[in-house]
Amino acid sequence: MANDMKNRHTSSVLRRIVLGAMVVIGAFMFVLPLATNLPGKSAATGNLMTSFRPHMTDAALAQTAADQRTMAAMGQQLNTTMLPALATQLHMTPAQLSAYLTANFPSVGAGLAQFSTILSRFGGLQSTMAAQESNFQQADQIPTGFLPPTSMTALFLIPGGLLMVLGAIGLARPRAARAMIALTTAVGVVVVGGLLAVSMSSKTSAADRMTTAFAPVFATQSVQQMRADTNTVEAMATEFSQKTLPAIATALHMTPAQMGTLVTQQFPAVAAGQAQLPQIVERMATATGLVESNVNNYNQSASIPWSSGSMVTMFWLMMVPGLLVVVAGAGALVFGGGRRRVASLPIPRAHAGAMHS
């Protein structure tokens, strides 16, 4: 009997320790997202993904790549073939024609001087987006395809709150301790099983790779350079179509229509680029605006859970507490003994003679 009482006492102490641990783990899971401003950061992540989603499709990326090829072909033919040919017809050297364009059409002159560099920078953005398409698609499923990133906070608060409440009930009502341990263990199983079921580890790894790849794009200097490049190309495109070509046509004693025919026949890449230039410049401006408007969203998203930023860290901050709950709870259920049993004492029977005394 003494051994039974000792075992019951040991089991009771073990249960209380485990229940106390459940409360502590639950408090950690509940406080963590609030302390790290996860609601605000996850909302910023959702805004970022929503903004970029239309631009990270196969069709959108293919269009961006086509724009890049069109502009590259136009720039190469313009600088290596068309301008030298026009210089010859105008009885100028290429250097003289360049000086003439710079003096009379400054936007065209500035644009031509920077064209290859600007094209290279936008090509870098296009390459980054294309290379990160797969990572984006995975990250866009955090936590699941039907739950938005803002639900990440609830994935901490709900299990954390349950662990605190169930653990507190078990501590306050010793007779319910075993049942509360079983329920908290079930919470841990749901957390761990849920993370594994939705492949959260691979999704968060993809998110970290994407965040790292886009860091140079969202750097302050890069964003400012994108805006300057876009303004340069917009001004060049407008002045080239509206002023430069008509002026050259006049100098060559041609009508604008004749000049257009000449360009189409002899410089098809330039003609194709000129025809598509308004749409290409518009898409370029859209890309620039996309980056500019999401700098703050990116910075907040990249700081999950804290300044150094790592979605993988956030995954482990959910997985480790879940595993601890499962291990501690299962251990208490296995080694903590069964339910308390009330010992039954034998009741002595009365002797027959005692009834007659």
Model regions and ranges:
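Extracytoplasmic/ectodomain regions of membrane proteins and secreted proteins
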Residues: 29-152, 197-318
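Juxtamembrane interface at the cytosolic side of transmembrane helices
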Residues: 2-26, 151-199, 312-357
